[in-house]
Amino acid sequence: MNIREWPAEERPREKLLQRGAGSLTDTELLAVFLGSGVRGCNVVELSRGLLVKFGSLRRLLEADREAFVGELGLGPVRYSQLQALLEIGRRHLATSIERESAMDSPAAVRRYLKAMLRHEASEVFGCLFLDTKHRPLAFEILFRGTIDRASVYPREVVRRALVHNAAALILCHNHPSGISEPSQDDVHLTLSLKRGLALIDVRVLDHIIIGDGEPLSMVEHGWIVV
């Protein structure tokens, strides 16, 4: 059945306008984003099939370009639109958190960093630079690729801390494998950066690892001491 023939309260777009986006299912949200179906398949049926194919809304959103554009009803235009929407969401979250008076909630920090890194397909390393009151100054992704002592240069982290006049910072990187537990390289790298930054009186408050599930704090798990 064509969606135009559905009762108004059951159409995803009208439902969103009447009740808000939070009232929609994953299928309905995806249907609103896609806007239209394909021949012989309305947009809700298409959305439902895509979620079954990818396994979840999250996996669809995190799919690489090749997997995404290869599906019926998707393509490079919608892939570009989706990437733009995801980046808008990340920037909105970043701006919202950066307006806070201080980032004194570990949970808020983890939510922020997860939003910044969770959609990265490869391993990336970043820093959240903070002032003397632990208010955010800036967030930067500094390195991409395999994150170890050979690929992350302490002098570059020190240089960026000086550029931002940071008093403290929080290190972060993602594990695309989904496993959050740090490797020995992660621990050694953190200690090396901690020593280097101490020379310019910049404190390393934590190193957050983003995988599947909840982000991991190396401080809370005892891998580093501040």
Curated annotation (Swiss-Prot):
Query: Where on this chain does Zn(2+) bind?
Result: 173, 175, 186
Q: Which CDD domains has this protein been placed in?
A: MPN_DUF2466
Tell me which Gene Ontology terms the entry assigns under biological process.
proteolysis
Keywords from UniProt, A to Z, are: Hydrolase, Metal-binding, Metalloprotease, Protease, Zinc
Q: Which domain of life is it from?
A: Bacteria
Q: Name one Pfam family in it.
A: RadC
SUPFAM superfamilies registered for this protein in UniProt: RuvA domain 2-like
Q: A Gene Ontology molecular-function term?
A: metal ion binding
Q: What S-S linkages are listed for this chain?
A: none
The record places the motif (JAMM motif) at 173-186
Locate the MPN domain: which residues?
A: 102-224
Entry similarity comment: Belongs to the UPF0758 family.
Q: Which PANTHER family match?
A: DNA REPAIR PROTEIN RADC (PTHR30471), UPF0758 PROTEIN YEES-RELATED (PTHR30471:SF3)
Protein name, per record: UPF0758 protein PP_5284
| Originating organism | Pseudomonas putida (strain ATCC 47054 / DSM 6125 / CFBP 8728 / NCIMB 11950 / KT2440)
